[in-house]
A protein has these predicted regions:
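Hydrophobic beta-strand segments that make up the repeating blades of beta-propeller
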Residues: 1-5, 54-58, 110-113, 162-165
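Short, solvent-exposed loop/turn segments at conserved positions within beta-propeller repeat blades
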Residues: 7-10, 59-60, 115-118, 167-168
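Generic short N-terminal amphipathic or hydrophobic helices
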Residues: 11, 23, 63-65, 96, ...
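Blade-edge motifs of beta-propeller repeat domains
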Residues: 16-36, 68-92, 124-144, 176-193
Length: 193
């Protein structure tokens, strides 16, 4: 399936994949209202129920809209396929959003960076199966105008680290993951230029 943000329409469109072998096709889109000016989306199972949910960074809304998937397998896809969104407060102008289990507790956390704030925020997942919730964000200082976010294990310790591109500085901020189960923490940024 495809999930696409619509910045000017304040919604996200989801296209159900109806492809068969050798033929690409999608069902008519279903739109879901978000906060102001959704910019990026990440897709993952956020409540460990085996279904893919999505989280949307709302640029002018200074928020994240989280949509819990309630669809049943092979059913027709409708506006009822996702629960009413959960909204998380963020700093102004969130841009890039990624999902990963940063603290190793088996739940998918969220990381987001901002265009006008020099921070990356991490929201620790406190969800239970069928109910999505997140703890208050933890903020980590970046360089100037951290515009894009990448995640991955950069040092081979089996923990997901964070890298942020800093537009004004022409640098990259790298954050080594020092989290333990239930607690999200990262080292002070290492700046690459």
């Amino acid at each position: 399936d495809l999930a696409v943000t619509n910045y000017g329409s304040n919604n996200i469109s989801v296209f159900r994949n109806t492809s068969t072998s050798g033929t690409v096709s999608f069902a008519t889109k279903v739109d879901f209202s978000t906060g102001l000016n959704p910019l990026t989306v990440t897709v993952n199972d956020l409540d460990n129920d085996g279904k893919l949910d999505f989280a949307v960074a709302n640029y002018w809304g200074s928020s994240i809209s989280i949509f819990r998937n309630t669809a049943t397998a092979n059913a027709s896809f409708t506006s009822a396929s996702f629960a009413t969104p959960t909204t998380l407060s963020a700093l102004a102008n969130p841009r890039s959003i990624k999902a990963a289990d940063f603290d190793g507790n088996g739940k998918v956390d969220l990381a987001i960076c901002y265009v006008t704030n020099n921070y990356v925020s991490v929201f620790r997942n406190t969800s239970t199966t069928g109910s999505i919730s997140y703890a208050t964000k933890a903020d980590f200082a970046t360089g100037n105008l951290g515009t894009w976010l990448a995640i991955g294990d950069l040092n081979g310790d089996a923990k997901t680290d964070i890298a942020v591109t800093n537009q004004t500085d022409n640098t990259v901020s790298v954050f080594q993951n020092t989290s333990t189960s239930g607690t999200v923490s990262f080292s002070t940024q290492v700046v690459l230029s």
